[in-house]
Swiss-Prot record:
Pathway: Amino-acid biosynthesis; D-alanine biosynthesis; D-alanine from L-alanine: step 1/1. Its EC number is 5.1.1.1. Substrate binds at residues 130, 303. The modification N6-(pyridoxal phosphate)lysine is found at residue 35. One of its GO terms (molecular function) is pyridoxal phosphate binding. The active site is at 35 (proton acceptor), 255 (proton acceptor). GO terms for cellular component: cytosol. NCBIfam families: alr. Its cofactor is pyridoxal 5'-phosphate. This is Alanine racemase. PANTHER family: ALANINE RACEMASE, ALANINE RACEMASE, BIOSYNTHETIC. The lineage of its organism: Bacteria, Pseudomonadati, Pseudomonadota, Gammaproteobacteria, Alteromonadales.
Amino acid sequence: MKPFPRAEISRHALKNNLARLHELAPSSKVMAVVKANGYGHGLLNVAQCLDNADGFGLARLEEALALRAGGVKAKLLLLEGFFRATDLVTLVEHDIETVVHHESQIEMLEQAELNKPVTVWMKVDSGMHRLGFVPDEFHQIYQRLLACDNIAKPINLMTHFACADEPDNDCTAKQIAVFEELTKDLLGDRTLANSAGALFWQQSQASWIRPGIALYGVSPVVGDLGTKHGLIPAMELVSQLIAIRDHKAGQPVGYGSHWVAEKDTKLGVVAIGYGDGYPRNAPLGTPVLINGRLAPIVGRVSMDMLTVDLGAGAKDNVGDKAVLWGKDLPVEEVAEHIGTIAYELVTKLTPRVAVCLD
């Protein structure tokens, strides 16, 4: 018997989305970003499904080690870089590449005793102002990295966009110009484009692109849908109705008696709540798909359950499937109702939600 709630992950969708990104950037290799448990889709499952990706991007060393332990042989890159000097031995042992974005990392590399140099990606702060070396110090830092015997040559180069998900914002064009001016005539691979870069900024498609959310069929742009760009949603979050109740006009439901029925209706109780990662702050009216129609959430989302208004004439039954998001109820639209972004919804699912690869 299939567990509820569960996140059903489509192999077909994942493979389609990777192929679509290859189409959009035919001259670039694809570093599939699978951090945060594959954006909630299952780290190892996603990496094994995307076995024709050219490499994988992770946030933490533990994620990279999990892929190696699972038999993944492809290029792995730590996008946040390493945190401790002791990590360097592990990087060498498991052939894991790292971003270098801060003076402290350079000092650790210079002082380390390694039996093999580490492949690094020097991060340029071209305008995001979060991580990376600012333009004024770029050439000095680059020469310092060249002089370090613990760093493999050539040095790879990267940056990250602040506003690529705003196609009409010229911030991205300025960042591209800053990066290209600094790195012209230098050797090494380059990567600029995240999902939004790959979709909307063709000039950012360098030797590598590193899509994240687009791999999972979701648009990086608020108010947009991944399906408009040939992507297929990879996750369907489902649960079931565990109770159906006749509800009289004037009666409240849920904690705080937050919602009161204006007319007689039927309410359905769905087995999912904030203990599963569904947002407690989902407002009244947030849609849930029941038997092909949208039923609005009424009352507050609780730890294990939420309640929907099925309507007075509802013919639904206990045990019927409830879709919280998926191909017929895009996660982008649910995120808009809740006032967040799809990234947050898919990555915040808790271990109580079974992740099932079809």
